[in-house]
Structure formats: structure tokens, C-alpha cells
Amino acid sequence: MSLDIDQIALHQLIKRDEQNLELVLRESLLEPNATVVEMMAELHRVYSAKSKAYGLFNEESELAQALRLQRQGEEEFLAFSRAATGRLRDELAKYPFAEGGIVLFCQYRYLAVEYLLVAVLNNLSSMRVNEELDIRSTHYLDINHADIVARIDLTEWETNPESTRYLTFLKGRVGRKVADFFMDFLGASEGLNAKAQNRGLLQAVDDFAADAQLDKSERQNVRQQVYAYCNEQLQAGEEIELESLSKELAGVSEKSFQEFTAAQGYELEESFPADRSTLRQLTKFAGSGGGLTINFDAMLLGERVFWDPATDTLTIKGTPPNLRDQLQRRTSGGN
């Protein structure tokens, strides 16, 4: 992995009681030795693999103003990180769920792009076996479960300040209040809505297939083509490119997919991040609620799975063997 650390600083927030978060600030930057580089490479990998929301700085963002001064050489990176950690402590202290953690600021390069990554990591205890086969306690950074993380694409921010996607952050599992506090600290608001872009793509694909007057099998083949392309982009960490996708669908219609989406006004970006959960709808139907979870391949609709919208009834012909076995055992037992 071609990751080069420019500057990295660690600080700590310690929760002493319900009211106070103690601030512990380093007096110097971390030396980017092999261990530190390995840690950042792992954090970069874990973060890149997670679903993210996109945002941009508000005009009054204190962090953005301080970062701009640091980038212009008017403030040292260590001083910037120390002041930012103080603001983070003040913001976090407003919330009853406030917990401590290791606060990390890292400015690094990856594939010719400069980033600033900000994270609050948990420092956990565990056990290890030493060379004498004795058990000893140890501490480690819980990188795999890091959920308070944001990353600023410094290259995008500085070359295209009107962008709505140079800032990314984790959203969802940690809860709304946690996301709110971190966005307040960053002085940022949500920008590009990747899920909405992916939903728009799915609708455009279905409309494109209908416009081309494809039969059911051909429509499903088109969806499978789109899914294969998008999933390949997702696995490679690349964005969905409308021009490239249009080339994949070149034989579907006389008009290109890109021309079709522009003419119909879907308002899709020329490129946008793939959203795994939304794209899955191209090949599967899934839903849950009221104690029921259903998931089946889209191609089975109308063949083995039938839906009657008038009665909202789903009929399944031929149940999976393991489900059938459970049903038979339960009914034969009289329960």
C-alpha cells in the first residue's frame, strides 16, 4: 500500500467522572516509523471499506479556518491538532454519552491524493501469551470498530472548493446524536447524497430497459450487467462512472444510457460512490418486519415467487430444503 505519512499526532480524552473529560496532549508529533505506518495503513483500509456519508465545511467552521492556516504554514500541525482536540473535548462534553478515547490527527498521501484523517479510537484491554507461555495483559487500538472517523480530501478541498464531497464521515451504526456531535465539531453539513444517487441510478436503469422495450429476461440481464460493473467499481474502491457504465450497456438501445439519463433529467452526477445496500436491489428483493425476513433473487419473481398487489400476498412455490425440514419437524410434532 502506497501510503506516506506527512504528519501525525495523538492526544487523549479521559473520562474521570460523569461531568469531566480530562485532556491529555502530546508535546510532540509521532515519529512515522514502520509501526505507525502499519497502523495508519490498517486504519485507511478499514475506513475505505466502510459505508460513508459525504459533506462539506460550513462557512463558519472553526476547524476549516484553522486547517487553512495550517496548510498555509501559519500554524504548526501539532498546535493545530492540540487546539482541535480541545474543541472536540468542549463539543463532546455537551452530550451525556460522552466517552474518552485516543484522538488521532494524520495528514498523509495515498495514490497522489493528500488527506487529513481525524478519528476517536477506543483503547481496549486484552490478553496475550508471551514467549514463556505466560498470559499477560495488553492494550490495543480498536481500529476495526472505529466509528467516529472523518477524512478530508485536502487535494479536492483546495483545488475544487465548490465540491460537496471532499469530506467523508462514518454514519449510521453510531447513532444520530454521535454523528451530530462530530459534524458540529467539524463545522460541516452533509453534501452529496450517495444513496440518493444510487437510487436514481436504479430507477434510470429500469426506465432505460423499459424504453428499449426489453422483455423480462433481457431487463434482468441489463440489471445484472449494471450490478456487475458497479460491484467491480465498489471492490476496487472506485466510483461509478456514467460514461463507462454507458459503454457497458452499448448494445441495449440505439441511444446511449448516458444520453438517456441526461434527456430524462435524473440529475445523476458524472461519477458518484457506489452504495452496496442500494445496488443489491438490482439482483435481489429483500425486506423484513413484523417478525418476517424475506430475501430472494430477482429472477425468481414471476417464476417461483408471485406477488398479488391486490391482497398483498406473496406466494412461494418450492421452499428451501432446510426451511422445509424445519416446517415438517414442527408440524409433525404438533406444535
Curated annotation (Swiss-Prot):
It comes from the Bacteria. Its main location: cytoplasm. One of its GO terms (molecular function) is single-stranded RNA binding. The keyword Cytoplasm applies. Pfam families: NA37. It comes from Klebsiella pneumoniae (strain 342). This is Nucleoid-associated protein KPK_1538. Belongs to the YejK family. GO terms for cellular component: bacterial nucleoid; cytoplasm. It is found in: Cytoplasm, Nucleoid. Keywords: Cytoplasm. The lineage of its organism: Bacteria, Pseudomonadati, Pseudomonadota, Gammaproteobacteria, Enterobacterales. NCBIfam families: PRK00378.1.
